[in-house]
A protein has these predicted regions:
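Rhodanese-like catalytic fold shared by cysteine-dependent sulfurtransferases
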Residues: 1-18, 22-75, 79-119
């Protein structure tokens, strides 16, 4: 399942709605960014869960980190929607309600009215 920018923006901060940034540490902190992105950083309030970590953890370790599947709705994003698609498939296989924000940071970073943070 995919969600769009407007839904992510509207639901930011909503209880049980968790935005997961599955990019690298440097991308998440805003220390590295693709040349095509006008600003570095992440969606404000996003939790970091690097795809490489997700691939390395056991299902129980993932559940410990994210909480019980019935308690959260997850939206994953990356730079362009590819890594987050894989993350979404993994999370859905574990019973999570997981959606992919396909526009990801490539889209979000272009709209200065959308909240972003670095560090």
């Amino acid at each position: 399942m995919d969600v769009d920018r407007d839904e992510v923006a509207r639901r930011l901060g909503e209880d049980g709605f968790v935005v997961l940034d599955v990019r690298s540490d440097g991308e998440y902190r805003g220390e590295t960014t693709a040349p095509c992105d006008p600003r570095p950083g992440r969606i404000a309030g996003a939790q970091h869960f690097d795809l490489q970590m997700l691939l390395a953890l056991t299902p129980d370790e993932i559940r410990t980190r994210l909480g019980p599947p019935e308690d959260v709705e997850l939206v994953a994003y990356c730079h362009s929607g590819s890594r987050s698609e894989l993350a979404t498939q993994i999370l859905a296989s574990l019973g999570y309600r997981a959606a992919n924000y396909r526009g990801s940071w490539h889209e979000w970073s272009r709209d200065d009215s959308l909240p972003a943070e670095t560090g």
